[in-house]
Amino acid sequence: MSPCENDPPINWKRNLIVAWLGCFLTGAAFSLVMPFLPLYVEQLGVTGHSALNMWSGIVFSITFLFSAIASPFWGGLADRKGRKLMLLRSALGMGIVMVLMGLAQNIWQFLILRALLGLLGGFVPNANALIATQVPRNKSGWALGTLSTGGVSGALLGPMAGGLLADSYGLRPVFFITASVLILCFFVTLFCIREKFQPVSKKEMLHMREVVTSLKNPKLVLSLFVTTLIIQVATGSIAPILTLYVRELAGNVSNVAFISGMIASVPGVAALLSAPRLGKLGDRIGPEKILITALIFSVLLLIPMSYVQTPLQLGILRFLLGAADGALLPAVQTLLVYNSSNQIAGRIFSYNQSFRDIGNVTGPLMGAAISANYGFRAVFLVTAGVVLFNAVYSWNSLRRRRIPQISN
């Protein structure tokens, strides 16, 4: 994988397409098992309503927790050995773990494997780092926005496919099907992605303090990490109460599950439509403007969600919120590209992933705690307050440093 002067230049557009496919496959693989995770926990011997809820929450959250712990290590290894190698490691490792999950005999085995899944993950942040280091800087927003739609598309289609497969073949076979998808992702990455990378010895690697001092604006980068965390907190805080809130709004209807599923899915559809377009706009006017505007827009949409009277009103607001959310993470990633070098891109994107995983763990806990004490509607108001704080914090960080104009 070491570069050679006679090698043809890397076709970053082809790599973007293949990386998008890889993110789609891993997004689908992760979400395939989500619809029946509590059912599988029950099948492994957990009984009783309280115990089932507790174990379902633990096995769901532990993956993100261990991913947050492991991401910086894999990011450092990516900066030493190359990002393609990390993509291959992640896809193959997760595929093997999925097979073992399908063979689990008790809840403790399953819990350990869910933790191992988090430890071996990291496909998406390494795909982001790979594309960020290859794409022309003036196209970063569009490229990273487009790449983000891969994981979103997979996450949207995965639960539907997982539910159908579980109904048709049972729960355990879905894990083997998921493993097959990840192995396919491994081979697609192996044969179709090109990277010119000169391995770096451990002695030549920058240490943490040197990474921080090499950043153009360390305080801004930290604020971007915090923004990523709050984006995930805001998204996750609504997830535990959404179905119950829809049931409260819908009243006595027979298809609450279908309505809830539709309302849960519409933000992802909106993000698919908005991410590449707003990313391209960010390349033109600046990703910092897109970020602040999308954060303020999110606040203005979250507040009325606490006052809606029908599921249709909630669905419309969530669609608009999804359009704003589609711009947020690509804008953050583009700003990270602008404020760091290729030498440390793997670690910067992995740190960002760690903050994202922490948000994935804390968001649902926050939403559940608020709803238990103050009701469903309070969740939206508190979340709006958190996002508003982040908008002010981000604006204050960004206005201190004008984003440099970077040419090809």
Swiss-Prot record:
GO terms for cellular component: plasma membrane. The keyword Cell inner membrane applies. The chain crosses the membrane at residues 16-36, 58-78, 92-112, 115-135, 146-166, 173-193, 224-244, 256-276, 290-310, 319-339, 378-398. GO terms for molecular function: transmembrane transporter activity. It is found in: Cell inner membrane. CDD domains: MFS_MdtG_MDR_like. GO terms for biological process: response to antibiotic. The keyword Transmembrane applies. It is a multi-pass membrane protein. Pfam families: MFS_1. Keywords: Antibiotic resistance, Cell inner membrane, Cell membrane, Membrane, Transmembrane, Transmembrane helix, Transport. InterPro entries: MFS (IPR011701), MFS_dom (IPR020846), MFS_MdtG_subfamily (IPR050497), MFS_trans_sf (IPR036259), Mutidrug-R_MdtG (IPR023692), Tet-R_TetA/multi-R_MdtG-like (IPR001958). It comes from the Bacteria. Its main location: membrane. Belongs to the major facilitator superfamily. DHA1 family. MdtG (TC 2.A.1.2.20) subfamily. Confers resistance to fosfomycin and deoxycholate. This is Multidrug resistance protein MdtG. It comes from Escherichia coli O81 (strain ED1a).
